[in-house]
């Protein structure tokens, strides 16, 4: 009796044109929304607290700085917040949840329209991709990247159908491509090179026009942002650009954590699929992932970001590789294909869910075992901003105490970690927050006769010089505030 309803449900999903899209979209929305709800009332994402919230709340003040940093996405969020009178935090969170949902639709559409998969297998592909660490990590705080990647996937999907699509859809494709290059420099570069490569393969007039328009616009953007962009290549030749974080061991471990489990099936999917237009960005991002071999110990080419982007494209081929292996009975742990799909999918769902929803110190998150190596490139879980959520609560209490304490009067200088700058800008009242890459050196300069030092107890990093008198003014579970006075 139970087989009939199951069969009917399977038939509805297999034959329906709208329900599969709704299923995939709903799963993606639920996954990304849960991570926001679990963290409430605190935001998640390093750039959310240190970039998006401060910039949107003080947009005019920040505009001279961000105007040459590909500001399309943050400007869009600001416009939505102003036009609809919605609090910036809500706009930021809602936007990434929706973008994540549309990203899942892009993956499903690729499965249906390019890989010629049926609805059930396209659903498998979509779920497989959205639960990957690289995708979730990007949605954690790299919102511009996630937005631009989603548009890029749709653009490449439509371009692969040229010349079989209408002029209107070609115009839509051009628009999506333009917005993508406006949104993010790295993804814009990736899309531009992919478009050039696809134009050589297809040799279509309409595609050539689209490519020409996109390349011209992206070139103008690069020219307009020349000073900001030119800084990266200059770092390569500088002896001062050595960055211990970007050492080969760390980057190799990051690459393996992101991609090792995906590579075997990814190679199968790469060989078996005809997704030439998606193979181009995969290969480009692979090259970017290993720029550290030629230019070691420098962040100039952002190899960690390229590793994440490579993993996102690899997950598409890896998912298709698993489908191919299951359909060809190369993976046959069960006599039923559906069970084999579930056997593959469930571990990835577990790993992705643990990363999205578990506390920062949870034993469920196996990535914590590699924290020593990959910690500088991202969080152990998504339940984190620039500090952990419990530390966020404690920090707000400390800031409230500072704002209301008579000793830390208005005009006082508060020194602290650069990771706290967003919190301080948003919450600290009538006081100056001071931070630097090295606060110890800043104190040693003796520029400040009297100030306060706010330290995170779990990782105190500032050494107080001997020529400063220090007095503990405030202490909590996570933070200590010291009053410092220079001895003359």
Task: For every predicted segment, state its role.
Residues 1-371, 377, 416, 470-473, ...:
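Membrane-embedded transmembrane-helix bundle of lipid-linked glycan/lipid transferases
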Residues 138-140, 190, 423-425, 461-465:
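Extracytoplasmic/secreted cell-surface and envelope-processing proteins
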Residues 172, 406-407, 445-446:
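Generic structural signal for beta-strand residues in well-ordered domains
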Residues 1, 345-350, 382, 434, ...:
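Terminal disorder- and signal-encoded targeting elements
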Residues 443-488:
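Aromatic/acidic, Gly/Pro-rich catalytic loop(s) in extracytoplasmic/lumenal soluble domains
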Residues 351-440, 449-456, 482-483:
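Short periplasmic/luminal acceptor-recognition loop of GT-C membrane glycosyltransferases, typified by
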Residues 177, 296, 400-401, 441-442:
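Generic recognition of flexible, low-complexity loop/linker segments
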Residues 185, 439-444:
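A short, acidic, amphipathic alpha-helical segment used as a generic capping/interface helix at domain edges
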């Amino acid at each position: 009796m139970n087989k009939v309803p199951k069969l009917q449900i399977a038939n509805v999903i297999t034959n329906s044109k709208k329900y599969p899209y709704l299923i995939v979209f709903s799963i993606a929305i639920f996954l990304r929304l849960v991570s926001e709800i679990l963290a409430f009332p605190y935001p998640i994402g390093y750039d959310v607290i240190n970039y998006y919230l401060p910039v949107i709340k003080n947009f005019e003040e920040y505009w001279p700085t961000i105007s040459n940093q590909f500001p399309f996405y943050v400007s869009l969020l600001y416009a939505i917040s102003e036009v609809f009178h919605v609090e910036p935090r809500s706009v930021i969170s809602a936007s990434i949840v929706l973008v994540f949902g549309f990203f899942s639709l892009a993956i499903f559409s690729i499965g249906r329209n390019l890989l010629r998969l049926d609805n059930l297998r396209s659903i498998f592909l979509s779920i497989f991709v959205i639960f990957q660490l690289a995708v979730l990590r990007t949605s954690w705080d790299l919102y511009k990247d996630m937005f631009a990647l989603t548009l890029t996937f749709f653009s490449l999907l439509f371009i692969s159908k040229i010349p079989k699509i209408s002029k209107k859809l070609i115009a839509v494709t051009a628009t999506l491509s333009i917005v993508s290059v406006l949104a993010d420099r790295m993804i814009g570069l990736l899309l531009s090179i992919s478009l050039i490569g696809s134009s050589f393969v297809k040799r279509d007039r309409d595609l050539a026009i689209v490519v020409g328009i996109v390349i011209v616009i992206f070139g103008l953007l690069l020219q307009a942002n020349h000073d900001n962009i030119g800084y990266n290549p200059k770092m390569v030749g500088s002896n001062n650009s050595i960055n211990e974080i970007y050492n080969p061991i760390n980057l190799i471990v990051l690459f393996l954590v992101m991609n090792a489990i995906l590579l075997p099936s990814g190679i199968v999917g790469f060989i078996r699929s005809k997704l030439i237009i998606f193979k181009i960005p995969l290969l480009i991002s692979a090259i970017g992932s290993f720029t550290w071999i030629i230019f070691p110990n420098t962040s100039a080419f952002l190899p960690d970001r390229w590793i994440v982007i490579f993993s996102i494209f690899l997950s598409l081929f890896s998912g298709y590789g698993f489908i191919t292996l299951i359909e060809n009975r190369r993976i046959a742990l069960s006599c039923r294909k559906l069970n084999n799909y579930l056997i593959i999918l469930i571990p990835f769902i577990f790993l992705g869910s643990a990363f999205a929803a578990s506390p920062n110190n949870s034993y469920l998150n196996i990535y914590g075992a590699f924290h020593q190596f990959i910690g500088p490139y991202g969080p152990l879980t998504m339940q984190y901003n620039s500090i952990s959520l419990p530390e966020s609560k404690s920090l707000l209490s400390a800031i409230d105490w500072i704002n209301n304490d008579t000793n830390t009067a208005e005009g006082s200088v508060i020194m602290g970690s650069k990771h706290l700058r967003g919190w301080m800008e948003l919450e600290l009242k009538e006081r100056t927050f001071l931070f630097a890459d090295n606060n110890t050196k800043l104190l040693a300069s003796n520029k400040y006769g009297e100030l306060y030092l706010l330290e995170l107890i779990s990782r105190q990093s500032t050494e107080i010089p001997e020529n400063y008198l220090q007095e503990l003014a405030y202490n909590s579970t996570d933070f200590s505030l010291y009053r410092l006075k220079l001895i003359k």
